[in-house]
Structures are given as structure tokens and as C-alpha cells.
């Protein structure tokens, strides 16, 4: 358990005012995001069959919450980690065409999460996915989409400032781009990727770190990524320097999704070629699924960022270790 306690923390809003601000941010953002990105809202599952291969393996070691159902004997059901793969299949199932897309409210349980100021076992995010052409699977498409998302987030700052002027946290005016290898080259003295993210975000304010998942020159990965949804050459994280906690805050992980070639290449690198026999993977190999770009935007993270909160538990209801709750309360951090 890692917990940062900011000095002389002032939550600015009462718990009830915070709840009202959360409602406003969530409702306003999803409407503006959907409109700006050209996305339709759809309903999404909270759990899927393990045999489908649809669940997100995240970094590879997290185990999903699973159970069995009376009317589906012999089938293991898993609570989703994310909807990264499900969304791509939904675009096909619902008949979405080129440059059309969807977003959904995704709720997940990640029981193996390391709990801290930003991380909870309960995950709530806007999961989105959009159809692109094979020719658009490039860095230009990725960067243009990142710029669009940043524009919506920045506009939300002004919306919140108007409604809650004393509480809003001000954001930088521009997002910068750097690859994970360029970041390692820039800070050779910093061995930990998180330290490099903190350094670049403190310098530039907001950064999109690109190309996450593959091994760097150092022999290490910047961060783990499942080999079967993001193309590791065309993905990244949106990070903000977060002054209240003096570190980087990751708002979104996103990317252009694997095609039939990059998926096989990445599965070979991780030794997960056995997944190629699963339904989702077969559909990609057979070119039955559309080429897409997609990602997730943390709902609680966005609320935390825009309201300058010290702990994600101030903007979402979850469960936390007693020691963490005690320290938070002693320092004016009111956990819901």
C-alpha cells in the first residue's frame, strides 16, 4: 500500500458538493466526448465467458474475479478487467461502419490492483472504440485522436470552473508527444519508468507517451501491455502532471488495435501463441473484425483531476485498507 499525503490538503468541497460535482462532470463529459468523437453510447457486459478470450489480460499476472452459473455448467464466467476486445467485436456485431464508433460505461473489478491514491480495485471508465481503415493504422491517426481527447478534457476544465470556481484544478494548454524509448534516452539516470514519466510531465505538463509494451534498448519494458489488443507501435498513455501529489496522473490508455500481423508478432514475443485458438483471435486472423482505434478514460480519475482531489476514494465508492482510511481521515481526505 503506497499512500501520498499532500501537505496542508484542502478538499475545497464538502462530500455532498463533491457528489454533485462528480455527477456534473460525468454527465457533461460523456455527452461532449461522444459528440466530438462521433461515438454512440451502447450497453456493455460486466462479465464474459472465459472461453471466449474476450477478457483483458492487462499486464498478464492479474487474475479476474470468476464464478460459475447454474444454467451454464462447465463454463467459467469472468468479471471484466476492461472491454478492450469486446468493443471490437461489438462494432462488427452492431454493424458500425468506417469512422463510426461506440462508447460505454465500463465497470470492472481488479482484485490484484496495488491500492494507492490513484488505483482502486473498482474501475470505472468510458471505454470507446472506433472503426478506421487499414491505411489509417498510423501515427498520424493516433496523434490526431489524442489531440481531440485532450481538447475535450481541457474544455471540461472551463465547464467545471464555471460551476465550481473554487475547486477546479487548472490544466496545461497543450499535450506533447514522446515515445517510451525517447523517454528512456532522455533520462538515462532514471531506471524506473514511472520516475521518467514524472520527470517529463513535471517539465511539460501533459504528455502522451507512445509505444508501450515492447522491450526497450535497456532490455526492460516501459510498462506491461497485453499482446492481443493494442499494437505496441501505435499506442500510449495520456499523462498529466498533478501538482497536489507531485507526480504524473494517467488519465487514459489507448491505441490503434492489432491487425492480423502485429497480433501474431506480439503473441510470439510474450509466448502466448496458444491464444490464437480462441474465438476473438481467430476472427482477427481471418480479418473478420474491423480495424479500430480505442481506449479507456478513467471516470474517477477525470473527476479527481478536475477537482484537485488527493485520493480516488474521494470521488468513487470502493473499499480500502483500514490503515489507509485512518491516515486519510487524519489528513482531511474524506473517503466516500
Swiss-Prot record:
It catalyses: L-aspartate + NH4(+) + ATP = L-asparagine + AMP + diphosphate + H(+). It is an enzyme of class 6 (ligase). It holds the Pfam family AsnA. InterPro entries: aa-tRNA-synth_II, aa-tRNA-synth_II/BPL/LPL, AsnA. PROSITE patterns: AA_TRNA_LIGASE_II. It is found in: Cytoplasm. GO terms for molecular function: aspartate-ammonia ligase activity; ATP binding; catalytic activity, acting on a protein; transferase activity. Pathway: Amino-acid biosynthesis; L-asparagine biosynthesis; L-asparagine from L-aspartate (ammonia route): step 1/1. Keywords: Amino-acid biosynthesis, Asparagine biosynthesis, ATP-binding, Cytoplasm, Ligase, Nucleotide-binding. Its EC number is 6.3.1.1. GO terms for cellular component: cytosol. GO terms for biological process: L-asparagine biosynthetic process. NCBIfam families: asnA. HAMAP family: AsnA. Belongs to the class-II aminoacyl-tRNA synthetase family. AsnA subfamily. This is Aspartate--ammonia ligase. The lineage of its organism: Bacteria, Bacillati, Bacillota, Bacilli, Lactobacillales.
Amino acid at each position: 500500500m503506497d499512500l501520498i499525503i499532500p501537505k496542508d490538503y484542502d478538499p475545497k468541497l464538502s462530500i455532498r458538493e463533491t457528489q454533485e460535482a462528480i455527477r456534473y462532470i460525468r454527465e457533461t463529459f460523456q455527452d461532449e466526448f461522444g459528440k466530438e468523437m462521433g461515438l454512440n453510447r451502447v450497453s456493455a457486459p460486466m462479465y464474459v465467458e472465459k472461453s471466449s478470450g474476450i477478457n483483458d489480460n492487462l499486464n498478464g499476472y492479474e487474475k479476474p474475479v470468476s464464478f460459475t452459473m447454474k444454467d451454464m455448467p462447465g463454463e467459467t464466467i469472468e468479471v471484466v478487467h476492461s472491454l478492450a476486445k469486446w468493443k471490437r467485436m461489438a462494432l462488427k456485431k452492431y454493424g458500425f461502419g468506417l469512422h463510426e464508433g461506440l462508447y460505454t460505461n465500463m465497470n470492472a473489478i481488479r482484485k490484484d490492483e496495488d491500492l494507492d491514491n490513484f488505483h482502486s480495485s473498482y474501475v470505472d471508465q468510458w471505454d470507446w472504440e472506433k472503426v478506421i481503415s487499414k491505411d489509417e493504422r498510423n501515427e498520424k491517426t493516433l496523434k490526431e485522436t489524442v489531440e481531440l481527447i485532450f481538447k475535450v478534457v481541457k474544455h471540461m476544465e472551463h465547464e467545471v470552473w464555471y460551476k465550481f470556481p473554487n475547486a477546479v484544478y487548472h490544466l496545461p494548454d497543450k499535450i506533447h508527444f514522446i515515445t517510451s524509448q525517447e523517454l528512456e534516452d532522455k533520462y538515462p539516470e532514471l531506471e524506473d519508468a514511472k520516475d521518467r514519466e514524472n520527470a517529463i510531465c513535471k517539465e511539460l505538463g501533459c504528455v502522451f507517451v507512445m509505444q508501450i509494451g515492447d522491450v526497450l534498448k535497456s532490455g526492460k519494458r516501459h510498462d506491461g501491455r497485453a499482446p492481443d489488443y493494442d499494437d505496441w507501435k501505435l499506442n500510449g498513455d495520456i499523462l498529466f502532471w498533478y501538482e497536489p501529489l507531485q507526480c504524473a496522473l494517467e488519465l487514459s490508455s489507448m491505441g490503434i488495435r492489432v491487425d492480423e500481423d502485429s497480433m501474431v508478432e506480439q503473441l510470439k514475443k510474450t509466448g502466448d501463441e496458444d491464444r490464437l485458438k480462441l474465438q476473438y483471435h481467430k476472427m482477427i486472423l481471418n480479418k473478420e473484425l474491423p480495424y479500430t482505434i480505442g481506449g479507456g478514460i478513467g471516470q474517477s480519475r477525470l473527476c479527481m483531476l478536475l477537482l484537485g482531489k488527493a485520493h480516488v476514494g474521494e470521488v468513487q465508492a470502493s473499499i480500502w485498507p483500514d490503515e489507509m482510511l485512518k491516515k486519510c481521515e487524519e489528513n482531511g481526505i474524506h473517503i466516500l
